[in-house]
Amino acid sequence: IQRCGRPIVLSLSPGPALIEHAWHYEKYANMWRITDDFWDHWDLLKDMFHRCELWQNHVSEGCWPDCDMLPLGTLGKGFGEERTTRFTAEEQKTMMTLWCIFGSPMMLGAELTLLDQETLALLTNREVLHLLNSDCHARQIRLDDDCAVWAARDAKTGDVYAALFNLSDETATVSVQLEELTETFGLSENDGDSTVSVTLHDLWSGCDTNTTGTTLSSELITHACVIWKILRH
């Protein structure tokens, strides 16, 4: 590879990679699978939150732990069982949000000629895809059986993001304290002040919501998520 005379990305599929060998993958490869084959089953997607937390400190320029291909759109043609993804619309959005905020390589495991407009829109949301930028650094700051919370910061612009995920099987309210974001990346010294006012820019809907207080929260249906860019007033 070093003698080929041109840049090459080396992608490994040890499936799943062992975290204790992280140094080896970072030194000798660019991408490496952190999971077995990933398919459109909710239990596999829910488990990916644990895997991403395990590997989140090993994402950097030229080093990308790989969550595997995105099972969206029409699948299974190569296996003789062509079908539409089993993921619900909300689960698809949750998967895209996690892959992007974590910084996974983005590869689509679908029949491209059969992509519908909804799937295409999901795959081409520029604001969500911006999180893949090497200047964005993310951490999972909470994970339990019912919810997950990720925070990210763009080192170049200073923009801070929060992603809330409902991992439970019923509608639930997921919350994060501004103080948690402050401790992770730093917004400002007075983020814990109850008078703090912010605008939450929803990356998926494009809608803005003004809020005041110390807690950000959203009521989410089962397996749904929301991701905001937090704009200070």
Indicate where each model-derived feature is located.
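Glycan-recognition surfaces
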Residues: 6-111, 142
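Membrane-interfacial catalytic/cofactor-binding modules of polytopic membrane enzymes
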Residues: 72, 119, 123-160
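Short acidic/proline- and small/hydrophobic-mixed sequence motifs that coincide with surface turns
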Residues: 170-174, 195-196, 208-209
